[in-house]
Amino acid sequence: QHAPVVIVGHSLGANAALLVGYELGKQGIPVDLVVTVDPTSSRPISPVVKRYLNIYLPGDGFGAKLAATGSGVDNDDIRNNPELNRPGVNHFTMDENPVVLKQIFDAIMPIVKAPGQKGAAKGRKG
C-alpha cells in the first residue's frame, strides 16, 4: 500500500498540480487527491487520480472549471456559495479564505488519517 498522495495548488500552482497529477498517473503512481484553487487551465485530467476538488471563480479572467466531469471531479464554483460569493473574495484572496481552507482541509484529512488514528499521518520530507 502506498502513502497518500495529495497535491494542492493555487492559480499557476493549480495548473502545475494538474500536470503533476497527470504525469504521476502516466507513471502508474496513484494520486488520491488533487486540489486546485482557481486554476487558469482546465486540464490535463488523469483517470488515475481518484478525486479532483476544484474551487474556482469563473469570469475573473483566471478561474477555470475542470474539463472532466464525473464522480471523481468536484467543480465548486464559489458564486454558488453564499459564504464566498461576496466582495473581497477573488482570485488573489480566495486561497487564504477560511471557508476555502476548510474545504481543502476537509478533503485532505480523510485521506491522510488512518482509521482509528487521532492525528494526521506524518508527512515525508525530501
PLM-predicted stretches and their roles:
Residues 1-69:
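Serine-dependent carboxylesterase/thioesterase catalytic core
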Residues 47-126:
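Lipolytic serine-hydrolase domain surface
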